[in-house]
Amino acid sequence: MTQLPAVEKQEEHLRLRIFLQPKASKDQIVGLHDNELKITITAPPIDGQANAHLLKFLSKTFKVPKSSIVLEKGELNRHKQILIPNPKVIPTEVNVLLK
């Protein structure tokens, strides 16, 4: 069985497979973790706060409207799949994972 890549470019969109660590000391893209992109955020995993904070962080990082980012899988899990349409910026930590 073939594993899916952590970061995948599809036309003008990016699909990220994320391992999320909430309640961290800062918001950051850490790098590759078991074939997923590890991201840490400061928000706790309570009442959707971590998901909302993640979307806000990704919105700022990729310079796209928060409302355009789609949480495709993992609403109640730390393993998430997110679609980012037409990112204006691709951070170095993500760009090195593109094939």
Swiss-Prot record:
Gene Ontology cellular component list: cytoplasm
Pfam family, one: DUF167
Gene3D superfamilies per the UniProt record, alphabetical: YggU-like
SMART domains reported for this sequence: DUF167
Similarity comment text for this entry: Belongs to the UPF0235 family.
HAMAP family (UniProt xref): UPF0235 (MF_00634)
Name used for this protein in its record: UPF0235 protein PM1313
Lineage: Bacteria, Pseudomonadati, Pseudomonadota, Gammaproteobacteria, Pasteurellales
